């Protein structure tokens, strides 16, 4: 096997790469299989041998080769589906072989797995998902054969097996302690960007961007370089996502990425110096085009760093010069004079000796036209007089900018002037000063194609968050000051809000800082509609802070912040969050923090919730039970009981119907306790005061009641008389004396009639009594007019 140095593990022999694997795929002995049963028996033998790590390593290597031979020679015999069913059984033994400590076994297993991945792709994803962590673990091995075998296996695996499980496994290595694993992850990200299908990439592109962002900030320089390559690949295929990623990093990273863009483009410049294709672009592929194109000499290219050359800019500059009309065509002798400088550019350059005296004098005359002359073609500002007298002013300016005498000598004054204008235009378009020796103006400017979603620079927010959690006191103080400015920005993204909320919660757990409390208040006022998830944890921190703070001044700041929360969030949402916090078994509150919570709940019920708001929910029920358990605690009873009683009174005053319905499900002890509390505190004080009765109205009500009672009594007496008349024998005889009833029923017994009359009288009297009681209750004078039901 040829030993080719892998690009992922630089230096040294005894390393393998992708070409070695491809050559070894078919380098196996032929194995014949006659049927599915025969193939199954052979696979059983393979599994039996490979599953024993103590088996002879030559036998295990042979069995790995047999797997490839069966796949190559026997797929037509037993069918693809049947073969795949047998191959999936090999997942465990192949993983064990990749994990082997002997390099020959590892290399052969990596070749076999890569062969299966290339041939079957996602159909063998079970094997790939099993072997990927093992292959990555081999990257940290110092033995180069083992490390490069594992690295090459990951290349085949990621390229041909495209599943979300594979990508999820890859993301775990972004925080690996081994730099080789992080570096290999960047290489695999290039493969994902280039080879995976767009439908699958669409859902994982944000994660790819985060991984690349992490890579370009890595501590290992080689990992950073691999991350920049992955960024360039992303830029080439998904430019919009690359622009978003570019905008999300800080200025130093942006400069590094722009330099990597220029370096990648200048690589083609360095490789194409003196080559025909690059010259053909500049000369338009014709001798006529070459006449007007100046020589980009090696001295000009050598004085610029490779990362500071933009091929597009050079092409634009030289093309603009080539379009300048020449007043006199060059002779054939001129074309024979070719520059053979080390740079290799072979553009024809005119010399004084080849043009003749007439041409030379014309050049001098044209170059010496005064700038104040009306007929001058020079549109540039007045220049100082030439001190050399040998070169025209345009050439001197170009020479001062480019520093190449061979280049300058090849230009006519018009060409030099046009080139100078092109250079000035390029500098101005890039926003750089006209006279500077800084090469940064040649770096390509990346313009995002889509506007940023947030007005705040993402890198600025991240930097402030990092400063707030820094161990340096000065940096942390500055970060907190900047945080107080950032929290009120209206265009923060949801992720930024989440990160800021976590930082504020962390700062609230430390020593009390008025700036932090003001930041929390501003944060809540500006973004309360999007902080429903933060509210519960934020309230817990505020209650703990209020309970532990001893200084009155700091307590005032805390109360101000809590009032901001009360006035900003929806009261129903606050009630739910407070109840969840109170019943949460994880967030245990100290006794003083419990008091702060009950005070907050009392203010919420009495001052911020509307009368009649429903609260008959399971959260409130659990909260009341929790509060009763707090009030029953003998150790903290004196602190908590008064505030718990206020909460109960507030609930009753808010909605008495829900309060009664809620307590119907409680045990009698709690109901009696609650009613005693309400009676002791006078629950009527929470309800609106009734109108004071006036004497005139009192007399009218009494008169109406008396009239109604008299009418009811008259009705009852008349009804009793009618019933008695109908049931008496005398009345019946009087009614029937004139004629004989043919349908008369036999007379009922007297005792039965008396019982019936008695029951009717009782029912009428009870109805009358209930009616009087109802009238008295509705008029509010039930206490003054008690009805004796025994009467």
UniProtKB/Swiss-Prot annotation:
Q: Which UniProt keywords apply?
A: Cell cycle, Cell division, Centromere, Chromosome, Cytoplasm, Cytoskeleton, Kinetochore, Meiosis, Microtubule, Mitosis
Task: Please list the residue ranges that the record marks as compositionally biased, kind Low complexity.
Answer: 259-271, 323-334, 372-381
Listed GO molecular functions? microtubule binding
Domain of life (superkingdom)? Eukaryota
| A GO BP entry | cell division
Compartments where located: Cytoplasm, Cytoskeleton; Cytoplasm, Cytoskeleton, Microtubule organizing center, Centrosome; Chromosome, Centromere, Kinetochore; Cytoplasm, Cytoskeleton, Spindle
Region described as Disordered: spans on this chain: 259-283, 315-391, 422-454
List, as start-end ranges, the regions of compositional bias called Polar residues: 422-434
List the GO cellular component terms.
basal cortex; centrosome; cytoplasmic microtubule; kinetochore; microtubule organizing center; mitotic spindle; spindle microtubule
Gene3D superfamilies listed in its UniProt record: Leucine-rich Repeat Variant (1.25.10.10)
Q: How does it assemble?
A: Interacts with hcp-1 and hcp-2.
Similarity remark: Belongs to the CLASP family.
Q: What does this protein do?
A: Probable microtubule plus-end tracking protein that promotes the stabilization of dynamic microtubules. Required for the formation of mitotic and meiotic spindles. Specifically promotes the polymerization of kinetochore-bound microtubules. Also required for cytoplasmic streaming.
Identify this protein by name: Protein CLASP-2
- Which organism encodes this protein? Caenorhabditis briggsae
Name the gene for this chain: cls-2
């Amino acid at each position: 096997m040829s030993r080719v140095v892998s690009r992922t593990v630089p230096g040294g022999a005894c390393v393998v790469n992708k070409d070695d694997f491809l050559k070894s795929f078919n380098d196996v002995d032929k194995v014949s299989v006659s049927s599915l049963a025969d193939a199954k028996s052979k696979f059983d033998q393979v599994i039996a041998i490979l599953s024993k790590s103590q088996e002879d390593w030559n036998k295990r290597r042979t069995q790995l080769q047999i797997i490839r031979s069966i796949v190559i020679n026997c797929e037509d015999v037993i069918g693809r589906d049947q073969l795949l069913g047998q191959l999936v059984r090999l997942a465990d033994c192949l993983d064990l072989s990749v994990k082997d400590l002997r390099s020959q076994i590892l290399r052969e297993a990596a070749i076999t797995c890569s062969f299966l991945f290339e041939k079957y792709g996602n159909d063998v994803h079970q094997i790939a998902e099993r072997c990927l962590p093992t292959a990555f673990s081999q990257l940290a091995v110092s033995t180069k054969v083992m490390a490069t075998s594992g690295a090459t296996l990951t290349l085949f695996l990621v390229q041909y097996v495209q599943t979300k499980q594979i990508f999820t496994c890859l993301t775990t290595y972004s925080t690996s302690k081994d730099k080789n694993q992080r570096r290999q992850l960047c290489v695999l990200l290039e493969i994902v960007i280039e080879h995976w299908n767009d439908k699958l990439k669409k859902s994982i592109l944000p994660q790819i961007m985060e991984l690349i962002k992490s890579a370009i900030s890595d501590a290992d320089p080689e990992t950073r370089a691999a991350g920049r390559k992955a960024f360039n690949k992303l830029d080439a295929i998904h430019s919009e996502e690359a622009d978003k990623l570019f905008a999300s990093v800080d200025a130093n990273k942006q400069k590094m990425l722009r330099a990597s863009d220029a370096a990648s483009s200048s690589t083609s410049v360095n490789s194409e110096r003196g080559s025909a294709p690059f010259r053909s672009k500049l000369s338009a592929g014709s001798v006529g085009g070459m006449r007007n194109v100046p020589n980009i000499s090696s001295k000009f290219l050598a004085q610029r760093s490779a990362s500071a050359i933009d091929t597009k800019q050079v092409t634009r500059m030289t093309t603009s010069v080539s379009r300048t009309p020449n007043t006199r065509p060059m002779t054939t002798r001129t074309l024979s004079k070719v520059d053979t400088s080390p740079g290799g550019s072979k553009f024809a350059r005119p010399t004084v000796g080849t043009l003749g005296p007439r041409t030379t004098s014309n050049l001098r005359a044209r170059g010496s036209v005064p700038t104040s002359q009306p007929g001058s073609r020079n549109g540039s500002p007045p220049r100082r007089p030439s001190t050399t007298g040998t070169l025209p002013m345009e050439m001197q300016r170009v020479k001062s900018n480019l520093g190449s005498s061979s280049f300058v000598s090849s230009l006519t004054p018009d060409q030099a002037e046009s080139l100078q204008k092109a250079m000035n235009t390029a500098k101005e378009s890039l926003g750089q000063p006209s006279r500077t020796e800084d090469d940064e103006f040649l770096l390509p400017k990346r313009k995002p194609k889509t506007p940023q979603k947030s007005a705040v620079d993402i890198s600025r927010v991240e930097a402030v968050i990092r400063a707030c959690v820094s161990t340096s006191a000065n940096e942390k103080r500055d970060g907190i000051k900047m945080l107080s400015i950032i929290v009120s920005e209206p265009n923060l993204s949801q992720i930024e809000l989440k990160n800021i909320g976590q930082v504020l919660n962390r700062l609230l757990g430390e020593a009390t800082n008025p700036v932090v409390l003001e930041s929390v208040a501003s944060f809540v006022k500006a973004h309360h509609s999007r902080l429903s998830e933060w509210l519960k944890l934020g309230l817990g921190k505020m209650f703990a802070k209020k309970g532990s703070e001893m200084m009155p001044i700091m307590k005032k700041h805390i109360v101000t912040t809590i009032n901001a929360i009360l006035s900003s969030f929806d009261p129903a949402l606050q009630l739910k969050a407070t109840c969840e916090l109170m019943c949460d078994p994880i967030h245990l509150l100290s006794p003083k923090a419990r008091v702060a919570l009950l005070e907050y709940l009392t203010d919420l019920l009495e001052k911020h919730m509307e009368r009649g708001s429903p609260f008959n929910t399971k959260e409130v029920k659990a909260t009341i039970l929790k509060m009763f358990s707090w009030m029953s605690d003998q150790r903290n009873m004196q602190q908590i009981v008064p505030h718990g009683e206020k909460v109960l009174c507030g609930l009753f005053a808010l909605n008495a119907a829900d309060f009664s319905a809620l307590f119907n499900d409680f045990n009698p002890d709690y109901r009696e306790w609650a009613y005693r509390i309400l009676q002791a505190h006078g629950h009527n004080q929470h309800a609106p005061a009734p109108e004071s009765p006036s004497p005139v109205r009192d007399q009218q009500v009494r008169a109406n009641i008396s009239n109604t009672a008299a009418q009811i009594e008259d009705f009852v007496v008349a009804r009793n008389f009618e019933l008695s008349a109908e049931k008496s024998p005398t009345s019946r005889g009087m009614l029937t004396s004139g004629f004989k009833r043919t349908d008369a029923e036999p007379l009922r017994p007297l005792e039965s009639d008396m019982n019936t009359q008695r029951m009717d009288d009782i029912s009428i009297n009870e109805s009358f009594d209930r009616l009087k009681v109802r009238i008295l209750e509705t008029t509010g004078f039930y206490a003054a007019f008690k009805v004796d039901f025994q009467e």
